[in-house]
C-alpha cells in the first residue's frame, strides 16, 4: 500500500426500489476482467459500478426479495455468477440472464468457488449436507484456485476437502466459536473469527489476531496480532506473503505473514461498522461497505484500477435527437417522409441511364503474383491472364456465381401452361453449367461454385417445389442438406459406394433385427434408398435421428447443434471412427442373410461368421509393443483399429547443397499404420512415470482401409497440394509384423516380379473439406469413383463430385487435385481391388418377413387391424396395398420478411411420423387393415395437428395409449419389407407420405390417385374428400382425418379409375370433375343443418 493511498470515492448504496429505504450491502466483489465493482443487498438485487468514480452501470434481481440476501460473486469471461440463499444466477455483465439454477436441497447456500483451473464448473455449499457442482459454460476459467477446497464450518473449524472425492484431508480449529472471514491464495489460508467471552450472557467478541495456515506443509503458522480486533482479512493478489486486515471501525493493517510484528497502518473514515471488505485483482484498489449503506473505494489516485487486462465495457448508446431540417429548394426529397403513392415518381430513372460504380478489384491468382518480379517502381511479369493490353475486366460479372438457383417447379409449370410448350426446356435454366476445361477448378484461388455450399429454397408448397433435378443430371442420387447433422452426407455417400460396406449394411437390414438404435440397419435403409432413387434426391432423416439419439454421439462431438469441435473435418473424422465401430458392433449382433460372395472373395472353405467377416473387412489387426526407455522392459496389448490416422514426417529445413527428400503417400500411410510414438507413461516395473516408446506390429490389414487425413499444419496442406500426390491404387504387403506400401512405378514393378503376396487396393473416394470465405460457409463434399460400385466393371474411372444434392461428373485430375487454401481431404477409403463391382443381392431373395406376421397386441379387444395370414396372404410383386399416414409437427416453420416485404420461408415445418395404416388392396378381405401402428416419438411435439391427423397427445404416450404403439424402426421396417417384396403402394398424395416416412419407392410400385385424377393443363390437384364426394358419393374427413378410412377411400377411387379407363370415358369424367370443382371451389358441399358425429376408427372382428 503506497503512501498516497486514500479514500478515492464514497457513494451511497442505492435502495432496492423507489419506495424502499436504503439497505446495507451483503456481498461485495471486484470483477476480475472488467473495471467493475459488484454489490448485492438483502433483497436479492445486484448492482455494478464502473471505474474509479463508481459510476452506476447495471442493476438486476437474481431472486425474489423474500429469499434473502445475495451471498457472493464469481466472475467468468461470459458473465457474472451471483449466489443467493436458494439459487445460483448467471447474467451477462450488461444484465440479461444467462441461466438461473434452483434445487430442492438448496436450503441456505453460503459460498461457492471454481472447482479447478481450466474447469468450467463451480462448487456451491451452505448449511446443508450436499455440495453442488454446477457446469457454468464451456470456456476458459480466468481465475485459478488452490489444490484443495477450503471450507469454514459453523464451529470455527477450517476443513480442507479433496476436490474430487470431497473428503476431508485436513482440519484445523481456527477459532473458538465462529469464523467471520477467510481468504485462501497460493499456499496460505488466513482467517479471523470470534470467541465466546461470557458463557452466561452468550456474548461473542472478535479475536485480536489472524490465524495463518500453510497448505504446502499442512501446518498452522504463527498468528498475526491485531489488537483492534480482526473483522476482515484479504491476501494481496500480487504480493504472495502480504495480507490486509481491517477492524469493524475502519482501522487497516498491511501485514507480512512472515514478519507479522511489523505493519503499515491506515484509517478509513467510517461513521458506523464495516461489514464487507474486498481487494481488487490488480491489488491497486480496496472496497469497503458499512452498515450505513455506503461504499468506500480506496487506492492511489494516480494509478487506481481494478484489473490489469480489463475488457471494454459495453455502454448504452445515446439516443440521437431527430435532425433539424431546413426546408429549402436545395433540400433533397429523400430526407422527408414520403406518403404512399400510386403513380411513378420523377426520380424513378430508367435503367439505361444508370450504371454501376465502384467495381470490386480483380481477384488475382496467388501463383500469378508469385511469378512477378519486383522493381523500384512496382512489379512486372508475363501476361498470362489472357487479357489484351489496357483491357478492363468486368469484375462484377466474374464475381457472380456461375450456378444460379433454379425456378420453383410450380413456376415452371405455370410458364409451361401459359406458353403451351412444356416439352421445350430453357437451356439457360435446365442445363447445369460445366466448368472450363482450360484450368482445373481445384487450382483456383477460391472455391468455385460447384464446390460451394448449396441451400434449398422454399416456396409456399414446401421443399417438394424445389427443383433438385437442376443440380443433378446423373443416375446417382444426392442427399438433402437442410436436416440437422447433414454434414454426414458426404461420409454416407462414400460408404455407400464402397461395395463391401454396402453389402454388409443391406445384408444386416434384411435380417430380423428390430433394435431401435441400430445404425447399421439405418445405413442399409439409406443405401437402399440411394440405389432405388436413380438420380433423384434422397434424405437421411431417420439415420440422423438415430445418430442423434445414440448416447455416445453427443459426448464425442458428433452432433452439429451440441458440438464445439472447431471444424467439420474433425467432426467427419470422429464420425468415421464412430460409424465403423457401430458397424463392427451391430453386424455381430445377428447372423447375416448371406455371405457366399465374401466366402468366395476371401477364398474361405465355408461362409465366414459375423466376427470373422467383420475382422476381415474392417479391422487392422495389430499388437502394440510398449517399451520403457529406462528399464528396457516391454509389454504388449492388442492394437486393433478400424480407422487409421495418417502420421506425417516432422518438418525439415532445406539443407544447402543437398536434395530435399520426397515424401510419398505410401510412406505417410506406413508411418500412420505402424504408428511409432514416444510419450510419458506408467512403468509397472519402475513404479513411476517414464519415457515410453510404442510401436505397432501389424498382423493383417482389412479389405476396406479407412484413413483419416489428420491434417494439422501448413506443411501437411502443402504436401496434399503436391500434384499427383494421392495415388488411385496402392499395393500392401504384410510380412513378419511389418507393413509395406507401394504406389506408382514401384507397385507395377512388384506386380511384375510376383515375388511377394501383394494386395492391390483401389481408391474409392474421399470426404473433402471445402473452406470457403465469408459469406459462404465451410462444408463437406465427397469425391467418389463410382466405377468401383457399378454392377458392371468399367475400364475407365468415373469420378463424381457429391455436393449434397448436387452431383456431377469430374475428371480424374480434378478429383485428385487438392488446394492448400480451400480443398483438403478429411476421410479416405481404399478397398481391395478384387472386391470392386462385387454386389451381393442375395438379401432380396432371402428377406426376413417375419415382422409382417407378428401381432404386437394379440390380446387387445380394440384392434383396428388383423395381420396377414402367412399361408393365404403372402405379399409379392402382384400385391396392391393401400397406404396412408398421419404426421405431427416437431418444429414450426421459420419465416422472415425479405427486402421486398414478402414472406420468405427459411425452414419449413418439420414433421414426424405418428401413424401408419396399410390396408389390403385385393382378395377376400379387401380394404381391411393389416398394419395400424402408432409411433413412439422421442422428440418433443409442438403441434399434434389433431384437426388434420386425428392424433391426440394421449395416442403417442405409452402410459395412456389404447393403440398399437411401436418404435419408428418397427413401423419403417414393415413398409421396407413390403417395398422389397415388390408390393405396389396405393394412396392419395403419397409423395408427402414417403417423404415423412423417409423411404424411396420406385415409380413402378406407386399408384397415386392424386395423379390418376389430374389434368396437367388445369394446374390443380384434387383432394381426397372432394373426389370421394363426387365419385363415391361419400363424405369423409368431416372433423379429423383417419388414415385407415383415407387408405380405403383411395382404394375405392382406384377401382373407379379402372372402370372409367376400361369404358374409355376417363378424359370426359376428368373434365366433369374439374367443371364441378370450379363451381364448388373444389370442396365437398355441406348441408347447413348437417350434424356430424365423428367416431374413432372402427374395431375389426373376425
Swiss-Prot record:
Database matches in SMART domains: EXOIII
UniProt xrefs under InterPro entries: Exonuclease_RNaseT/DNA_pol3, PAN2, PAN2-PAN3_catalytic_subunit, PAN2_N, PAN2_UCH_dom, Papain-like_cys_pep_sf, RNaseH-like_sf, RNaseH_sf
Residues of the USP domain: 446-833
EC number assigned by the record: 3.1.13.4
Highest rank taxon of the organism: Eukaryota
Gene Ontology MF annotations: metal ion binding; nucleic acid binding; poly(A)-specific ribonuclease activity
Cysteines engaged in disulfide bonds, as pairs: none
Cofactor(s) demanded: a divalent metal cation
Biological process per Gene Ontology, one example term: mRNA processing
Coiled coil spans: none
Record note on cofactor: Binds 2 metal cations per subunit in the catalytic exonuclease domain.
Matches recorded under Pfam families: PAN2_N, RNase_T, UCH_1
Presence of keyword Secreted: no
Annotated spans, Disordered: 423-442
Domain notes from UniProt: Contains a pseudo-UCH domain. This ubiquitin C-terminal hydrolase (UCH)-like or ubiquitin specific protease (USP)-like domain is predicted to be catalytically inactive because it lacks the active site catalytic triad characteristic of thiol proteases, with residues at the equivalent structural positions that are incompatible with catalysis, and it cannot bind ubiquitin. It functions as a structural scaffold for intra- and intermolecular interactions in the complex. The linker, or PAN3 interaction domain (PID), between the WD40 repeats and the pseudo-UCH domain mediates interaction with PAN3.
Protein name per its UniProtKB record: PAN2-PAN3 deadenylation complex catalytic subunit PAN2
Organism: Chaetomium globosum (strain ATCC 6205 / CBS 148.51 / DSM 1962 / NBRC 6347 / NRRL 1970) (Soil fungus)
Lineage: Eukaryota, Fungi, Dikarya, Ascomycota, Pezizomycotina
Designated gene of the protein: PAN2
Amino acid at each position: 500500500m503506497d503512501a498516497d493511498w486514500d479514500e478515492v470515492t464514497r457513494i451511497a448504496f442505492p435502495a432496492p426500489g423507489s419506495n424502499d429505504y436504503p439497505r446495507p450491502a451483503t456481498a461485495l466483489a471486484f470483477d476480475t476482467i472488467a473495471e467493475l465493482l459488484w454489490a448485492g443487498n438483502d433483497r436479492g438485487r445486484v448492482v455494478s459500478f464502473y471505474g474509479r468514480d463508481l459510476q452506476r452501470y447495471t442493476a438486476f434481481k437474481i431472486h425474489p426479495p423474500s429469499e434473502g440476501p445475495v451471498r457472493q460473486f464469481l466472475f467468468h469471461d461470459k458473465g457474472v455468477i451471483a449466489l443467493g440463499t436458494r439459487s445460483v444466477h448467471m447474467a451477462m455483465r450488461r444484465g440479461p440472464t444467462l441461466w438461473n439454477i434452483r434445487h430442492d436441497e438448496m436450503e441456505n447456500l453460503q459460498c461457492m468457488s471454481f472447482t479447478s483451473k481450466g474447469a468450467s464448473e463451480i462448487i456451491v455449499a451452505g448449511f446443508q449436507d450436499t455440495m453442488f457442482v454446477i457446469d457454468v459454460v464451456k470456456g476458459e476459467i480466468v481465475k485459478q484456485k488452490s489444490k484443495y477446497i477450503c471450507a469454514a464450518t459453523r464451529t470455527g473449524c477450517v476443513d480442507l476437502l479433496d476436490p474430487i472425492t470431497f473428503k476431508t484431508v485436513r482440519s484445523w480449529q481456527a477459532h473458538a466459536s465462529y469464523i467471520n472471514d477467510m481468504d485462501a491464495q497460493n499456499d496460505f489460508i488466513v482467517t479471523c473469527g470470534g470467541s465466546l467471552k461470557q458463557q452466561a450472557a452468550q456474548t461473542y467478541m472478535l479475536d485480536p489476531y489472524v490465524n495463518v495456515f500453510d497448505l504446502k506443509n499442512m501446518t498452522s503458522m504463527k498468528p498475526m496480532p491485531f489488537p483492534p480486533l480482526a473483522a476482515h482479512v484479504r491476501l494481496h493478489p500480487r504480493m504472495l506473503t502480504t495480507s490486509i486486515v481491517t477492524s469493524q471501525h475502519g482501522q487497516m493493517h498491511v501485514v507480512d505473514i512472515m514478519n507479522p510484528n511489523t505493519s503499515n497502518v491506515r484509517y478509513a473514515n467510517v461513521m458506523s461498522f464495516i461489514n464487507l471488505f474486498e481487494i481488487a485483482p490488480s491489488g491497486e484498489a480496496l472496497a469497503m461497505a458499512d452498515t450505513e449503506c455506503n461504499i468506500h473505494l480506496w487506492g492511489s489516485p494516480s494509478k487506481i484500477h481494478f484489473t490489469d487486462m480489463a475488457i471494454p465495457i459495453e455502454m448504452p448508446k445515446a439516443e440521437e435527437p431527430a435532425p433539424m431540417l431546413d426546408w429549402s429548394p436545395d433540400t433533397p426529397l429523400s430526407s422527408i417522409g414520403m406518403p404512399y403513392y400510386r403513380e411513378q415518381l420523377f426520380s424513378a430513372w430508367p435503367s439505361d441511364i444508370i450504371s454501376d460504380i465502384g467495381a470490386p478489384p480483380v481477384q488475382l491468382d496467388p501463383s500469378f503474383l508469385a511469378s512477378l518480379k519486383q522493381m523500384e517502381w512496382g512489379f512486372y511479369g508475363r501476361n498470362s491472364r489472357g487479357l489484351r493490353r489496357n483491357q478492363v475486366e468486368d469484375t462484377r460479372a466474374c464475381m457472380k456465381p456461375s450456378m444460379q438457383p433454379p425456378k420453383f417447379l410450380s413456376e415452371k409449370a405455370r410458364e409451361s401452361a401459359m406458353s403451351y410448350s412444356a416439352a421445350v426446356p430453357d437451356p439457360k435454366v435446365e442445363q447445369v453449367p460445366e466448368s472450363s476445361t482450360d484450368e482445373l477448378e481445384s487450382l483456383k484461388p477460391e472455391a468455385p461454385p460447384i464446390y460451394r455450399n448449396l441451400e434449398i429454397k422454399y416456396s409456399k408448397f414446401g421443399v417438394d417445389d424445389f427443383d433438385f433435378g437442376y443440380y443433378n443430371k446423373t443416375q446417382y442420387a444426392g442427399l438433402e442438406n437442410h436436416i440437422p447433422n447433414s454434414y454426414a452426407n458426404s461420409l454416407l455417400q462414400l460408404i455407400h459406394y464402397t461395395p463391401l460396406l454396402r453389402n454388409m449394411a443391406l445384408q444386416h437390414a434384411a435380417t430380423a433385427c428390430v433394435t431401435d438404435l441400430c445404425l447399421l440397419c439405418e445405413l442399409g435403409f439409406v443405401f437402399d434408398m440411394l440405389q432405388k432413387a436413380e438420380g433423384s434426391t434422397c434424405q437421411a432423416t431417420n439415420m440422423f435421428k438415430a445418430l442423434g439419439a445414440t448416447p455416445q454421439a453427443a459426448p464425442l462431438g458428433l452432433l452439429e447443434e451440441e458440438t464445439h469441435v472447431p471444424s467439420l473435418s474433425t467432426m467427419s473424422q470422429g464420425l468415421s471412427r464412430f460409424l465403423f465401430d457401430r458397424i463392427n458392433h451391430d453386424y455381430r449382433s445377428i447372423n447375416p442373410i448371406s455371405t457366399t460372395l465374401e466366402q468366395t472373395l476371401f477364398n474361405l472353405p465355408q461362409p465366414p461368421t459375423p466376427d470373422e467377416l467383420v475382422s476381415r473387412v474392417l479391422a487392422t489387426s495389430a499388437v502394440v509393443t510398449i517399451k520403457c526407455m529406462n528399464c528396457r522392459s516391454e509389454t504388449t496389448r492388442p492394437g486393433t483399429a478400424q480407422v487409421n490416422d495418417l502420421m506425417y514426417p516432422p518438418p525439415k529445413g532445406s539443407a544447402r547443397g543437398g536434395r530435399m527428400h520426397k515424401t510419398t503417400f505410401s510412406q505417410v500411410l506406413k508411418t500412420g499404420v505402424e504408428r511409432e510414438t514416444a510419450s510419458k507413461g506408467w512403468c509397472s516395473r519402475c513404479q513411476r512415470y517414464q519415457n515410453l516408446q510404442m510401436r505397432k506390429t501389424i498382423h493383417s490389414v482389412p479389405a476396406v482401409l479407412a484413413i483419416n487425413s489428420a491434417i494439422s499444419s501448413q506443411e501437411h496442406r502443402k504436401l496434399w497440394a503436391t500434384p499427383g500426390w494421392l495415388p488411385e491404387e496402392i499395393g500392401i504387403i504384410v510380412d513378419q509384423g511389418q507393413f509395406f506400401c507401394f504406389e506408382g512405378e514401384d507397385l507395377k514393378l512388384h506386380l511384375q516380379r510376383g515375388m511377394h503376396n501383394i494386395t492391390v487396393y483401389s481408391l474409392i473416394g474421399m470426404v473433402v473439406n471445402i473452406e470457403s470465405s465469408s459469406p459462404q460457409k465451410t462444408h463437406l463434399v465427397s469425391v467418389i469413383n463410382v466405377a468401383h460400385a457399378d454392377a458392371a466393371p468399367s475400364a475407365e474411372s468415373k469420378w463424381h463430385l457429391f455436393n449434397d444434392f448436387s452431383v456431377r461428373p469430374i475428371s480424374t485430375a480434378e478429383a485428385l487435385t487438392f488446394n492448400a487454401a480451400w480443398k483438403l481431404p478429411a476421410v479416405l477409403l481404399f478397398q481391395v481391388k478384387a472386391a470392386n463391382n462385387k454386389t451381393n443381392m442375395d438379401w432380396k431373395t432371402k428377406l426376413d418377413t417375419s415382422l409382417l406376421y407378428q401381432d404386437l397386441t394379440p390380446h387387445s379387444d380394440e384392434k383396428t387391424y388383423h395381420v396377414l395370414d402367412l399361408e393365404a396372404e403372402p405379399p409379392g410383386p402382384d400385391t396392391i396395398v393401400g397406404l396412408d399416414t398421419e404426421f405431427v409437427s416437431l418444429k414450426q416453420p421459420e419465416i422472415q420478411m425479405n427486402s421486398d416485404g414478402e414472406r420468405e420461408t427459411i425452414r419449413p415445418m418439420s414433421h414426424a411420423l405418428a401413424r401408419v395404416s396399410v390396408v389390403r388392396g385385393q382378395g377376400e378381405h379387401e380394404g381391411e387393415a393389416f398394419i395400424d401402428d402408432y409411433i413412439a416419438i422421442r422428440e418433443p411435439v409442438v403441434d399434434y395437428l389433431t384437426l388434420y391427423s386425428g392424433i391426440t397427445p394421449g395416442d403417442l404416450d405409452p402410459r395412456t395409449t389404447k393403440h398399437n404403439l411401436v418404435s419408428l424402426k418397427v413401423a419403417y421396417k414393415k413398409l421396407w419389407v413390403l417395398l422389397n417384396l415388390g408390393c405396389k403402394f396405393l394412396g392419395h398424395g403419397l409423395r408427402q407420405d414417403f417423404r415423412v416416412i423417409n423411404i424411396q419407392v420406385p415409380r413402378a410400385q406407386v399408384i397415386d390417385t392424386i395423379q390418376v385424377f389430374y389434368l396437367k393443363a388445369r394446374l390443380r390437384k384434387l383432394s381426397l374428400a372432394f373426389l370421394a364426394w363426387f365419385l363415391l358419393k361419400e363424405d369423409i374427413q368431416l372433423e379429423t382425418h383417419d388414415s385407415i378410412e383415407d387408405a380405403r377411400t383411395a382404394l375405392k377411387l382406384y377401382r373407379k379409375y379402372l372402370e372409367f379407363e376400361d369404358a374409355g370415358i376417363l378424359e370426359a369424367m376428368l373434365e366433369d370433375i374439374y367443371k364441378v370443382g370450379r363451381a364448388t371451389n373444389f370442396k365437398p358441399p355441406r348441408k347447413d343443418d348437417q350434424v356430424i358425429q365423428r367416431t374413432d376408427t372402427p374395431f375389426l372382428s373376425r
